[in-house]
C-alpha cells in the first residue's frame, strides 16, 4: 500500500493529533475522532504547541528513541508466530489487531484482503534488525514494515519498552 506524504506544515502543534485522527480509523470510532477534531484545529490555528506535561511528570524518555512499527500479516497464526519470535529475540513488544481490511494495487490489479495488523513497539535503533527479521520470516513477497518515531507518550511505558528490548535480559523486568 502507498500513501502520500503529509505536507511539512502538518508536523507540529495539533497537526499530529489531526493526522492521527484520520490515520488509524479502525482503532478509533468516527464519532470519537470527530470530537477530537476541534482541539486539533484550534491548536493548529493558534500556532501554539499542545500542552506539555509538567516537569514533575516528565522522566528521562528521549523523544524518538522508541518507534512504533506496523506489519500486516495474512492471518492470526502467522502474526502470532512472528510476534512471539520478535519478543523472544528482544526486538519488540507487539499488539495484534485482527480483522483489518487492506485495499491496495498489486501487479496491476486492485486487491482486497482481510489481514491482521501487528502494532510493534521497539527501540528506534532496533528498527533495521526488526525489519530484516520480519522480511526473513514473512510469507509475503513484499512485507509491509513501516516505523514511526514516538515523540511523546506514557514515560513509564516507553521506558519499559526500552527495558524489554535491551540486548541483555534482565530477570527483574516484568511485563505490565
From Swiss-Prot:
The keyword Signal applies. Residues 1-30 form the signal peptide. SUPFAM superfamilies: GlnB-like (SSF54913). It holds the Pfam family CutA1. One of its GO terms (molecular function) is copper ion binding. GO terms for biological process: response to metal ion. The keyword Mitochondrion does not apply. Homotrimer. Belongs to the CutA family. This is Protein CutA. It comes from Bos taurus.
